[in-house]
């Protein structure tokens, strides 16, 4: 019953340093965009070393890294489909 669906599912990429680099870059970009666009980034619980994360609070960092992972998944799948990864 599910076999035809498995046939059209894209192949996943094995984890490698290239894949890790793409994910790191996407997260850094998302943190930079979040730092520039979030109105009150330091609200909520504080991080142990807030200066390392640009003074962002826990909620802002969690939100930006979540967005970074979503962007990273799309970038990794797109680059894998093109044969770059």
UniProtKB/Swiss-Prot annotation:
GO terms for biological process: photosynthesis. It is found in: Cellular thylakoid membrane. The chain crosses the membrane at residues 12-34, 54-76. Pfam families: PSI_PSAK (PF01241). It comes from the Bacteria. Disulfide bonds: none annotated. The keyword Transmembrane applies. Its main location: membrane. GO terms for cellular component: photosystem I; plasma membrane-derived thylakoid membrane. Gene3D superfamilies: Photosystem I PsaK, reaction centre. It is a multi-pass membrane protein. Keywords: Membrane, Photosynthesis, Photosystem I, Thylakoid, Transmembrane, Transmembrane helix. Belongs to the PsaG/PsaK family. This is Photosystem I reaction center subunit PsaK. It comes from Parasynechococcus marenigrum (strain WH8102). The gene is psaK.
């Amino acid at each position: 019953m599910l076999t035809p669906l498995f046939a059209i599912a894209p192949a996943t990429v094995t984890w490698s340093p290239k894949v890790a680099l793409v994910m790191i870059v996407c997260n850094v970009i998302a943190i930079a965009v979040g730092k520039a666009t979030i109105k009150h980034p330091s609200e909520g619980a504080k991080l142990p070393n807030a200066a390392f994360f640009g003074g962002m609070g826990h909620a802002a960092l969690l939100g930006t890294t979540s967005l970074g992972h979503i962007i990273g998944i799309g970038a990794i799948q797109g680059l894998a489909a093109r044969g770059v990864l």
